Amino acid sequence: MEFPVARNPQVKWKTGMLNEAEEMKDADFPEIRLFHVEHQLAPDGEKEDCVGKWVVCNPENLKDFSAVGFVFGRKLYKELSTPVGLIQSTWGGTHAESWTSMKVMENNPLYADVLKQYSKEKVSREKDKCKVPATLWNGMIAPIVGSVSYTHLRAHETVLDL
């Protein structure tokens, strides 16, 4: 089973759990793995594959997992007795529209202004290219077919309407 999870890579790993030190020490689950998707822009269409690396859930690698991903993966593993693959596909400071498919945006009037505002020609600075609508969907999500997502979005009002 594979499930994408996200964490902010700029934030030091903290679970918010009262027993955080114990959780980290006991986090030895070789059948729970995390695939970290490398950053890949794709403004011109969906990619068929993505690049990344797998890490095993152990005390040393737990810092690579989000707290939600770790707890979720552990719960699935214990309840289902099956290996679990978690997928982390993140890019800090990006907009929800970058992670939304062009098909969804073109068929939803809520996105009309967004699509006008962010034409490829208007995004010239390299650091802003990750904010082009659908570019992160195309490069980092579309290659991962059939996934469940958990994320903390700033644009939750728009996303919830989908």
Please identify what each model-predicted range represents:
Residues T151, A155-T158:
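Conserved small/polar residues in nucleotide/adenosyl-binding loops
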Residues L162:
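Cytosolic catalytic cores of cyclic-nucleotide second-messenger enzymes
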